[in-house]
């Protein structure tokens, strides 16, 4: 139990929380850009679960089949995460994230706009969305290496980015619930269209990030 206590005489005062670090971090534009990118990425993580009820209620897929569509994401995750990291190291993180956002946008728009598609096509689209989703989720924080965020506030920066970037965990279920309660089965279409638009916003976020990094490199020369 003594391991949980620190001697007040030996405590390092520099380790205490400093609110000024939060203010310093919130003044960094790259932190807000990362918040936007993470937020757009995590929207899909919180939305793919609706593929299951959409498949069973709109496409007429059996309950077992709808469950398989959701579980399939867990099997794709390790391959997409590792593969995305390898490709990001070779081709560049922003480029891979842009491609992944585009894949998610195309897949989600197709699911929303073509409700009479065949089940194999639907499963293939879901698989593509999962690949893009876990590819981005696996490399989003690696962008911090290029962001020029000072090491002394990097922990605080991660805290701020996560606090804002993970807001979809609260917002998405509430939003989806309101849309589905209002429009019933048609609500899936509207919700997926909104998700697709957010994926396009993610691409814009990457473009802003690239421009910010170019300016930063020019200033450092």
Q: What role is predicted for each listed range?
A:
Residues 1-11, 205-210:
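C-terminal membrane-cytosol helix-exit motif in multi-pass small-molecule transporters
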Residues 7-35:
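Juxtamembrane intracellular "pre-TM" segments in multi-pass secondary transporters
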Residues 29-81, 137, 172-173:
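Extracytoplasmic gate region of multi-pass secondary transporters
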Residues 62-70, 118, 122, 154, ...:
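Juxtamembrane helix-start elements in MFS-like secondary transporters
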Residues 81-92, 180:
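Helix-to-loop junctions at the C-terminal end of transmembrane segments
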Residues 93-143:
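C-terminal transmembrane helical hairpin of 12-TM major facilitator-type secondary transporters
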Residues 148-184:
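A late C-terminal transmembrane helix in Major Facilitator Superfamily
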Residues 178-199:
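A membrane-interface helix-boundary motif in multi-pass transporters
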């Amino acid at each position: 139990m003594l391991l949980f206590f620190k001697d007040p005489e030996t405590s390092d005062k520099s380790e205490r929380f400093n609110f000024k670090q939060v203010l310093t971090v919130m003044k960094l534009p790259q932190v807000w850009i990362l918040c936007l990118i993470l937020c757009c990425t995590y929207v899909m993580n919180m939305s793919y679960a609706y593929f299951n009820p959409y498949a069973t209620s709109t496409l007429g897929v059996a309950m077992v089949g709808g469950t398989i569509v959701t579980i399939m994401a867990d099997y794709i995750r390790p391959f997409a995460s590792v593969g995305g990291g390898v490709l990001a190291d070779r081709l560049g993180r922003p480029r891979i994230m842009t491609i992944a956002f585009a894949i998610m946008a195309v897949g989600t728009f197709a699911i929303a706009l073509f409700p009479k598609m065949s089940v194999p096509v639907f499963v293939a689209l879901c698989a593509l969305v999962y690949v893009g989703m876990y590819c981005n989720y696996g490399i989003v924080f690696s962008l911090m290496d290029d962001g020029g965020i000072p090491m002394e506030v990097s922990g605080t920066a991660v805290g701020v980015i996560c606090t804002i970037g993970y807001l979809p965990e609260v917002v998405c279920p509430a939003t989806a619930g309101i849309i589905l309660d209002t429009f019933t089965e048609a609500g899936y279409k509207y919700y997926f269209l909104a998700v697709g638009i957010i994926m396009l916003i993610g691409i814009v976020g990457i473009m802003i990030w690239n421009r910010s990094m170019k300016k930063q490199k020019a200033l450092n020369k």
